[in-house]
Regions:
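Short, acidic/turn-prone active-site loops that include or flank metal/cofactor-
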Residues: 21, 78-82, 107-109
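His/Asp/Glu-enriched, well-ordered alpha-helical/loop segment
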Residues: 37, 43-50, 92-180
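A structural signal for short secondary-structure junctions
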Residues: 47, 68, 95-96, 164-167, ...
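Short, charged, surface-exposed secondary-structure boundary motifs
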Residues: 84-88, 112-114, 184
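C-terminal cap of metal-dependent C-N hydrolases
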Residues: 168-222, 230
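C-terminal regulatory/interaction regions
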Residues: 222-231, 235, 242, 248-264
Length: 264
């Protein structure tokens, strides 16, 4: 870890690291070092603005606040952690301590989709339910996590995350006339942001532009063969399933049995 830190400092890179991701990690840290992960990293000097701490699944509110105060950032993947662990990470404590939070979708096999609209909605709802408070994690806050604050958290705030002079032209065009996003009101109540966070699914995105290049127009992907990629992904998944079915180690996994039974 110290060597990684030296290289990152020398090259001006951030460190992307899963931190306090699960109870097994914490258990192993206590057995090996007598310290929980956040304290261990703090002792090594890794908790600073160069660390993107992913998940914080098992971090306490106090540990999350410590990481935030040190200047580290959080990559929050509400969907996958909710599905896999049934836990709401301490993003509220992290933000309350002044930390920057970025939203991530983790992995398709972990949350069943890579959809930032879904992550916005789940982040808002999970935290409202956890704290029994409808004012926790309002729509505008999670939208910022998905855009400008998320970009800042991963060290790209000067390049992307908002439409400003000098930044890269990354944008999407959303069909606000879609039934699930209607009506749109400007006053006395403005509902565009809540509609995007709570009602959008991503299918309302008509056009995608990255660095000024249009990658999708009117829902037609221009730079990739979408059909071929989907077909290949399906075939690769079948091959993985075949190998897992023949692997005696995987056959003993309770998680696999639960998935076969449709319990997840």
């Amino acid at each position: 870890l110290l060597q990684v830190k030296r290289i990152a400092c020398r090259e001006g890179w951030m460190i992307h690291m899963h931190v306090a991701q699960g109870d097994r990690e914490i258990e192993q840290m206590l057995k090996r070092y007598g310290r929980r992960t956040p304290d261990f990293l703090d002792d090594l000097g890794l908790l600073d603005g160069g660390l993107l701490a992913v998940h914080l699944t098992e971090a306490t509110d106090e540990e999350a606040a410590l990481i935030a105060r040190r200047g580290s950032r959080l990559a929050l993947c509400s969907g996958s952690i909710g599905i896999i662990d049934g836990i709401v990470p301490p993003a509220r404590a992290f933000r309350d301590a002044g930390g920057l939070v970025s939203l991530g979708s983790d992995q398709a096999s972990g949350n069943n989709c890579s959809n930032i609209f879904t992550e916005m909605k789940l982040t808002a709802l999970f935290n409202k339910i956890r704290f029994r408070d409808p004012e926790v994690m309002p729509a505008w806050e999670v939208l910022r996590m998905a855009t400008i604050e998320g970009a800042r958290a991963i060290g790209l705030g000067d390049e992307v995350g908002s439409l400003e002079r000098g930044k890269q032209a990354d944008l999407i065009l959303v069909d606000l006339g879609a039934p699930n996003l209607t009506p749109v009101l400007d006053g006395p109540v403005r509902n565009i942001v809540p509609n995007l966070v709570y009602a959008a699914s991503g299918h309302e995105v008509r056009t995608v532009m990255v660095a000024g290049q249009v990658l999708m127009r009117d829902r037609q992907v221009l730079t990739l063969n979408e059909g071929a990629i989907v077909a290949e992904a399906q075939e690769q998944a079948r091959e993985v399933a075949r190998r897992v079915a023949a692997d005696p180690v995987h056959r003993e996994m309770a998680l696999l049995s639960a998935m076969e039974a449709g319990q997840l």
